[in-house]
Amino acid sequence: MSWDPAQYLKYASERLRPALDLLARLPIEAPQTVVDLGCGTGNVAKILAARWPGARIVGIDNSAEMLAVAKASTSGGTQHEWIHADLADWVPKEPVAVVFSNAALHWHDDHATLFTRIFGWVAPGGMLAVQMPDQYAAPSHVALAAVVSSERWRDQLGPLLRRSPVAPAASYFRLLAAEAAVVDAWTTEYLHVLPPAEDGVHPVVAWTKGTALTPFLAVLDGEAQQAFLADYSARVTIAYPALPDGRVLFAFRRVFVVASRAMR
């Protein structure tokens, strides 16, 4: 699956805000190594480097397109290391002080196994910090499921539909509490005010083109893509009516998990 960094970065500030909120909950002062799981274009990794200038920042992502942007933005520097790998396969060579993941783990199933595995990477006194979209019940994703399941698209796109792997915040507390010294898990719903899209595309469609729509658009050719987007846009326009000035209110729910490992 190919990602479009430019499309994703159209709403860079809105996508960055949850990462900043997550980072604010980490009291650790001078970690030696910080792993950014699902680092994407490197926006968050650069903020991690600014927060901890003495740390080695290791960005992991399975998108070559995203990593190319990340590498270009930090060329000439020595603080960052970029690794092209799948989160399901990659393992650090040694325990890590901070494992940070912003808007990536919702693409992976079996969170009971996944979270147990990545918390196992955390060094004594270290922290795991995760933020994940929890948007499957929102109108944007309900509309997507309805279009994909329609007679026109279900044979080709239906197999790509996934059940949300993201559980309620309390589930992650229960999952990690036995191994962690402290677990802090919560849910936040952001109300984004999206500006009118410059190309006339509904703002919520423009947003989801950078994320949730990507797997579906990847298997369609140009003409089919436009037909699919038209079907999706028709539903989204009803679900998210524009304000008089063309802006759109877009509620977005996210789950946060911070777990600390005790010092030995």
Show the residue positions of the predicted features.
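C-terminal helical/coil "lid" or tail adjacent to the Rossmann-like core of SAM-dependent
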Residues: 3, 179, 184-244
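Local beta-strand N-terminus motif with an aromatic residue
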Residues: 31, 96-97
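Class I SAM-dependent methyltransferase SAM/SAH-binding core
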Residues: 33-37, 41-90
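A conserved beta-strand element that flanks and buttresses the S-adenosyl-L-methionine
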Residues: 100
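Short catalytic micro-motifs in class I SAM-dependent methyltransferases
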Residues: 103-104
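Conserved catalytic/acceptor-binding region of the Class I
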Residues: 112, 119, 123, 127-198
